[in-house]
C-alpha cells in the first residue's frame, strides 16, 4: 500500500491534476453550518448509539492505492437497500455471486492486485445497454468502458481485466492492450505468435460521462445507508452535474467518515483510447454542503475540509 504501489502502477497521488483542480480552504457560511449541525443531530437521532456520526474525526490524507476500479452494475436503482449484503462476496444470488468469482480469479491474475471491486446502483442512467438474460454488466474505470459478461465467463473476464492468468507474462492480448489503442495492439502482435491472440476477448462500450459515486452500503453500515439517498437528491439538484452520472456504490472505506463520495472527472474526453481521468475522494459530506462542494468543482476547486485525497490516471 502507499507510494510504492502507486509508483508500480505508474500513478501518482497528484497535486497537479489533469483537469487543473486546486485545493482551497472555503469557510462555510453560517446558514450552511447551522444546516449541517441540524442534519447531524437528525441523523444521530435515527442511528444506534454505537453507529453515530462524529464530525471531529480527521480525514485520511490519501485514498486507497489502486490502479483500476471495476463496478458491477446492479439491475435496479434501489438494489442497494435489500440486495447488498454486508459483504457482497457472500451473496449467493446472481449477479452478485459474480463478485466472489471475479475477485477470486484476480488473486491469480498477472496484474490482479490494486483493483477495487464494488457494486453500483445508477440513479436513472440512460447510457447503459439493455441487460441480457444471464449476463452481468461491469463498468471499468478509468477507461470508462461497460462490458456485458455472460455468467459462465466471469473468471475469464477477470483474467482479461487482470492481464492474463498466472504471474508469467500473458500469452494473449488483455484489457490494457485494448485500452491503449490499436497502435499498441499492432506493436504487441509484432512481438511474435506467443505474445498475442487475434481479436479482443471482450468488447466494451464507451461510458462518456463523468461519474459521481456515493457510498450507500446500508447493510454494512447504517450511516452511509441513511445519508446516501439524501446526498443523491442534493446532487441531482445541481445544474453543473446535469451531464454527470450519479450512482450509489458499495463499501469504499471509512464509514465513520460518512458521507463518502468519489468524483471521476474525465479531464480530456478527446483521449478516446485512454482517457485522462482524475479521481477525487471526499468524506464527511452532508447534503447541506453539496452546493458549496459542487460550486467549487465547477471552478476546478477542491474543498479541503472534505478532501480525502486524489489520483490521476
From Swiss-Prot:
BP GO terms, sorted: cell redox homeostasis; protein-containing complex assembly
Name of the protein in question: Altered inheritance of mitochondria protein 32
PANTHER family: ACTIN PATCHES DISTAL PROTEIN 1 (PTHR31902), ALTERED INHERITANCE OF MITOCHONDRIA PROTEIN 32 (PTHR31902:SF7)
Family that this chain belongs to: Belongs to the AIM32 family.
InterPro entries in alphabetical order: Aim32/Apd1-like (IPR009737), Thioredoxin-like_sf (IPR036249)
A single Gene Ontology CC term: mitochondrial intermembrane space
Amino acid at each position: 500500500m502507499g507510494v510504492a504501489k502507486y509508483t508500480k502502477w505508474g500513478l501518482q497521488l497528484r497535486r497537479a491534476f489533469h483537469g487543473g483542480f486546486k485545493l482551497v480552504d472555503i469557510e462555510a457560511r453560517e446558514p450552511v453550518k447551522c444546516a449541517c449541525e441540524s442534519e447531524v443531530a437528525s441523523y444521530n437521532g435515527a442511528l444506534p448509539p454505537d453507529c453515530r456520526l462524529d464530525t471531529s474525526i480527521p480525514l485520511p490524507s490519501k485514498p486507497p492505492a489502486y490502479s483500476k476500479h471495476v463496478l458491477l452494475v446492479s439491475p435496479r436503482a434501489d438494489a442497494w437497500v435489500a440486495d447488498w449484503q454486508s459483504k457482497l462476496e457472500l451473496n449467493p444470488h446472481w449477479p452478485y455471486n459474480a463478485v466472489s468469482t471475479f475477485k477470486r480469479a484476480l488473486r491469480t491474475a498477472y496484474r490482479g492486485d490494486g483493483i477495487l471491486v464494488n457494486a453500483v446502483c445508477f440513479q436513472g442512467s440512460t447510457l447503459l445497454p439493455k441487460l441480457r438474460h444471464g449476463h452481468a454488466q461491469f463498468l471499468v474505470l478509468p477507461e470508462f468502458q461497460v462490458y456485458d459478461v455472460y455468467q459462465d465467463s466471469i473468471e475469464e473476464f477477470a483474467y482479461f481485466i487482470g492481464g492474463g492468468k498466472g504471474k508469467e507474462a500473458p500469452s494473449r492480448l488483455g484489457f490494457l492492450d485494448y485500452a491503449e489503442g490499436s497502435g499498441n495492439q499492432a506493436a504487441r502482435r509484432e512481438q511474435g505468435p506467443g505474445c498475442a491472440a487475434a481479436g479482443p476477448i471482450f468488447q466494451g462500450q464507451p461510458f462518456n460521462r463523468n461519474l459521481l459515486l456515493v457510498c450507500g452500503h446500508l447493510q454494512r453500515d447504517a450511516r452511509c445507508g441513511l445519508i446516501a439517498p439524501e446526498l443523491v437528491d442534493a446532487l441531482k439538484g445541481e445544474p453543473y452535474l446535469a451531464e454527470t452520472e450519479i450512482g450509489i456504490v458499495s463499501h469504499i472505506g471509512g464509514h465513520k467518515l460518512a458521507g463518502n463520495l468519489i468524483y471521476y472527472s474525465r479531464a480530456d474526453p478527446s483521449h478516446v483510447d485512454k482517457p485522462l481521468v482524475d479521481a477525487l475522494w471526499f468524506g464527511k459530506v452532508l447534503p447541506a454542503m453539496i452546493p458549496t462542494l459542487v460550486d467549487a468543482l465547477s471552478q476546478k476547486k477542491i474543498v479541503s475540509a472534505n478532501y480525502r485525497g486524489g489520483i490521476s490516471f
